Amino acid sequence: LISRRVRGLGVEADLLPADTPANALDHYEGIILSGGPASVTEEGAPMPDANVFGLGVPVLGLCYGHHLMVQMLGGSVRSTGRSEYGKAVLEVKDPDRVFDGLEVSQTVWMSHGDLVESLPDGFKVLGITADCPTAAIGNTDDNLYGLQFHPEVHHTPKGVDILRNF
């Protein structure tokens, strides 16, 4: 679904396995780490090549990808013990790149059981919801962004705009 949304924006998109070596990705203009059913708190969770964050291209982590990026770069993620599933109201605190030109309050779709507990160095909170104080984060110097919500689904009305901004 993510690739379909990106292609719908007129951008070429390839769907690659999580274990693709970073040196095979250096010709891309951006990388999206997708969501999925796994948890970074579990043994054997799929992990990308850590060098993906040093390629000098923008990286967007969505849900599980958001958790991966945080954990791999030195932040922490914990299981909430329950799932958040459904609509939430995102309050944009810093209208950086991904939220440029968008409303400061918008509906987003959540589907997760883990939560970012602490941010890696260089990251800041870009948006929050009532139940998620790290719903959108970014390291704007390195063009690394993480979203707890799912911009690719139609339940996030401005999701395509967020992907376009990325």
Feature-to-residue mapping (PLM):
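Short, charged, surface-exposed secondary-structure boundary motifs
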Residues: 25, 86-93, 119, 137, ...
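Histidine-centered divalent metal-coordination motifs
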Residues: 63, 112, 150
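Flexible gly/pro-rich beta->alpha loop and the following alpha-helix that scaffold active-site loops
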Residues: 2-62, 66-67, 71-73, 164-165
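A conserved active-site-flanking secondary-structure segment within enzyme catalytic domains
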Residues: 17, 50, 57, 67-113, ...
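Residue-level signal for well-ordered alpha-helical positions
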Residues: 2-5, 72-76, 102, 122, ...
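Proline-centered loop/turn at the N-terminus of a beta-strand
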Residues: 56-60, 107, 124, 143
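A glycine-centered loop/beta-turn motif at secondary-structure junctions
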Residues: 119-122, 128-166
